[in-house]
Amino acid sequence: MKEITQLLEEFWIVKDKNTTDYYRIKRSIDNQMKNFLTDFVGWKLFVTNKLIKLEKLPAEAHPFMGIQRFESVNEYMLLCALLIYLDEKMDGTHFLLSELIENIEKIIAGYADIDLTRFTDRRSLIKVLKFAVEMSMLKISDGSIEAAEQDQSKEVLYENTGLSKFFSVNHDSSISEYTDYHDFENRSSLYTDDETDMVRTNRVYRRLLLQPSMYWDSDDDMDSIYLINQRQYIYKHLDKYVGGRLDIHTGAAFYMISEDNVFGKIHPSEKSISGFIALMCGKIREDIATINNSK
């Protein structure tokens, strides 16, 4: 149970970085867990000699699902260019920052107005490189990225770990004609009737697992119909592998993770801001009650 919640919480489990969890999770993976993740949720589970990754594709795109430290589209484009560059490198290959910059500029030319001699664009690249190091896609063999951020003449020697090939999603069909994220959400038109039923099942499980809530505004909503009709079966699966409580109300459903399996950012936390927020909410509720009673 805790193994799946950790796979939900973390992008991937890298063996060199977290050896204990890597082997613990690897030992826990059985055919039943694989069937739940692939057949019902529709996610791919990668287990290699370097990492374990649950490819958590959402049913719907939401702002909180992005890379939180990234602040512009250009930073995502620089990350994509970095992934393209690393894809052509053998595992363990070393390269200099100047070589990387030269190749990224070639890759990105014609797609965006990015000049890596400009302070803002170079700062964006440094942010992307720091992210790649934290994600274990790159290792710094020599030099300092902070020094290179302040002085463009400074070099950094990087090593390609080979993990970048598992970072992006491998889609089952071409996405070359897609123009925005809605195209990924509306792929159901590509499937047969039987496949559409499977896609609906996957979508409901994904919404419950990755979103704080699942809403609908029509009695004809197919996802809600499936959820209500199959609620006992869905709850049984989620309780077995994740642990929690499925609450269904008029127009909304919530999957509440049990206290023992809570992951991610939670409220209230031990920080003082949590106590302040609780006090403010209590005061607001008192004021609302006073206003209502005075009517």
Model-derived regions: residue spans:
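Intrinsic, low-complexity N-terminal interaction/targeting segments
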Residues: 53, 67-75, 115-119, 123, ...
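Positively charged, polyanion-binding regions of nucleic-acid-associated proteins
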Residues: 9, 73-94, 274-294
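Extended Gly/Ser/Thr-rich low-complexity repeat segments
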Residues: 64-75, 266-273
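A charged, low-hydrophobicity C-terminal interaction/regulatory region common to genome-maintenance complexes
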Residues: 259, 267-269, 292
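Short helix-coil junctions and helix-kink-helix linkers
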Residues: 15-27, 102-123, 134, 217-224, ...
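A short glycine/small-residue-enriched secondary-structure motif
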Residues: 46-60, 74-80, 101-106
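Internal, well-ordered domain-core segments that constitute the primary functional module
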Residues: 84-162
